[in-house]
A protein has these predicted regions:
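Pro/Thr/Ser/Gly-rich low-complexity, intrinsically disordered linker/stalk tracts
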Residues: 1-31, 73, 88-119
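Recognizes extended acidic, P/S/T-rich segments that occur
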Residues: 27, 34-76, 86-94, 98
Length: 119
């Protein structure tokens, strides 16, 4: 396990796609092996409420429309990205994210929030 605290991702951008999915991307972090996107329900402003997670080993991620929290026109949703120097383990992305998040691994600080507003 790496003892160095990885850098938080920079230049995170996101878009609510026409099909209802969300696409995020960010600058790759040197030596990062995985990233955990954290996100909130609609209109939650406190980062501590970003209790939903995804998992990716690249510097982009798409949340399927079926997994996006219900949003009405004008609703906001926030995303944060966290870097890990380890790869998650598990049968699916949720298990991989929980393995890192709940395990004894040192993730980065979270990125600045990406705020998306449903039109």
């Amino acid at each position: 396990m790496s003892l160095l605290h990885p850098n938080a991702p920079q230049n995170v951008t996101g878009v609510l796609n026409a099909d209802g999915s969300v696409s995020l991307s960010w600058d790759a972090v040197p030596k990062a092996k995985s990233y955990i996107p954290h996100y909130t329900d609609a209109n939650q402003t406190d980062p501590h409420d970003a209790n939903k997670m995804g998992y990716t080993e690249t510097n982009s991620w798409t949340l399927s429309a079926a997994d996006v929290p219900h949003l009405e026109a004008g609703d906001e949703i926030r995303f944060y990205i966290q870097t890990y120097n380890e790869v998650g383990q598990g049968a699916n992305d949720i298990e991989k994210a929980r393995y890192l998040h709940d395990g004894e691994f040192l993730g980065s600080a979270w990125s600045r929030p990406v705020l998306l507003i449903k039109k």
